[in-house]
Every structure is written in structure tokens, then in C-alpha cells.
Amino acid sequence: MEIRVIGRGALAGLVAGILGFLFAWIFAEPTIDKAIDYESGRMNVLSTVHTAMGHPVEPDGPELFSRSIQSGIGAATGIIAFSVAMGALVAVAYLVLHGRFQVRPKVLGWTTAGFGFLGVYLLPFVKYPSNPPAVGHEFTMEARGFLYLGMVWGSLTLLGLAVFAARKLSAKVGWARAVGIAVLGFFVLYGGLLAALPSLGDLAANVEHAGEFGFARAATETPQPITNTFDTPVTVDGKVYAPGQLIY
């Protein structure tokens, strides 16, 4: 039985992964391409300005995988593999919880999947939405990754604690009151987690780079338009930009 249930979960994940890749390929990849073009052009302008001012400019690293591979087989492999793994994990969670709650198997299955959706995607998304569509500020990539994973871990932990509390309290106050208390406690702790973690645009690295040319603080990690913040005109590709004028 266990192998069959896990296999069904993995199969459901496979179907979801294929649909997810098709959606990404049709709707998301064009936006990502535009974002990459924007960031590449922005970096070229910054390199030109820094070179003209005599500042050292680091060369671009080698491209390990072409954009066509990234948006094609790379995205397909990543999305489908992740979806299969998530489907199998939901099936394992279902097997662990089966028999511990007096609910029908179908209800338990949908509830387990729903809690997984909340903990892995929706609740972390409230604090750290998926932005930017390309790379964003390179100096915050590592911090963003750790913060997002921390938000996922915190969300799943709080959901687990809420279920545990509701189950323990149900014997004393009944299921309805137990669920109400657990939900209220969850939102209080979840609100504390949202307040405790730093917001995008306010990370330590953002503050550190606040005075650099071409950087502007914003409530996002998408690089902002470049403005001439110097007291003198700046020449880029033969065009002169006055102080305060938008360059790119």
C-alpha cells in the first residue's frame, strides 16, 4: 500500500510539473527574457560609466549554460523534478498521518496537500514574493535565498504546531474551539515571524551599497533606473547626461 500511495503522489507531481513547465514556458519565460535584457543593458551602462571614471570593472564570468538551455531543458528538469519530489513528500506525509485523525482518506489527502501549499508557497510568498524575474541585486542573492528558506521552515513549523495544538486541545474543549484557538495562535506567531524577518530592499547589503552610483533603495530587489547622481555631466556612448538626468 505504501509504495502505491507514494507512486500515485509522484505521478500527480509529474503531471503538475509538466503543466507548471508549460505555464512557465508560455507566460513566465518572455517576462524573464525582458528582465534579463534590462539588467544586461543596465550593467553595460554601469561598466561604461565606471570605465570612463577610471574605476576598475570586473569582467563578466563565463556563461555555463545558454539562455535557451536554461529556459528549455533546464527549467523543465528543475520544475518537473521538484514537483515529483513534492508529490512524493505529500504522499509520505499522508501515510504518516493516516489513522491519526478521524477523517476520511480523501479529506486527509486534500488537507495534507493544502497545508503543504500553504507552508511551502503561499505563506512565504506573503513576506518574500517572487521577485525580481531575473537576477536582481547580485550582492543580496545569498541572503535572499537563506531568508526565503527560513520563511518556508518557519511557516511549516507553525502549521505543524497549530495542528498539534488543535489535536491536543480537542479532548478538553472540543474540535471547534480547539481549531479556533489553534488558528488564532498561528496567526499571532505568523505575524511575529513576518515582523521579525527583514523586508526586501532593507537587507544589510542594501544599506551597505546605498551610496554607490546606479543604486537606489526600493522595496524590491529589482535594480532601479540609473540616474546621474554626480555634480558634473556624464558621457555614455557619446551622449551627455546632465546631473539628475535619467541615464538608463
What kind of feature is each model-predicted range?
Residues M1-Y248:
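Juxtamembrane/disordered regions of integral membrane proteins
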